[in-house]
Amino acid sequence: ALCVGLAALFATDADALVVTGATSVGPEDLMPRLLSGTGSLDLHGLAVRPASPTGLGRAPDGRPVLLLPGNPVSCLCAYELLVGPLLRALGGRPDPWSFPHRVVDRELARKLTSKVGRTDFVRVRLDDDGRAVPLATSGASNLSSTVVADGFVLVDADSEGAAPGERVRVHLFDDRP
């Protein structure tokens, strides 16, 4: 069924192809193998939490194919970091890699922890004092933390996080203050 679906996807006239789910490394995660067997799989696995099972390749005709994780928060993160910029570039945007979100500088309400060696996409909400409150970072399928989030903070791969009171750049999901 996935082979038929992938063939149908390749038959479209879309400029880029985006697939969600079945992108990790388990026996049921067939998309990376299918793509490498029919087109090319140029990148699989990112040092980003929670989007690590993301992949990037090409259809047989050279069009970009993005493999996004099936977990909702992982998929959102992969979209923000790869799909959005790719679509903006294909659309002719002059600076496609900049995030389209309004960015605000906020004080952290509590400790934000991260692991050196990977970039973390941390959902945050803004409290009544305007401080950034890190939300649950475990569980890529933890959609509830994203639903209540006002935005996200990207923690660089060389950082262990930030202490309460430190200032962070919050990428807002919408135009609320």
Which stretches of residues belong to each language-model region?
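Flexible glycine/proline-rich
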Residues: 34-177
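N-terminal small/polar loop signature for handling phosphorylated ligands or for N-terminal nucleophile
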Residues: 1-37
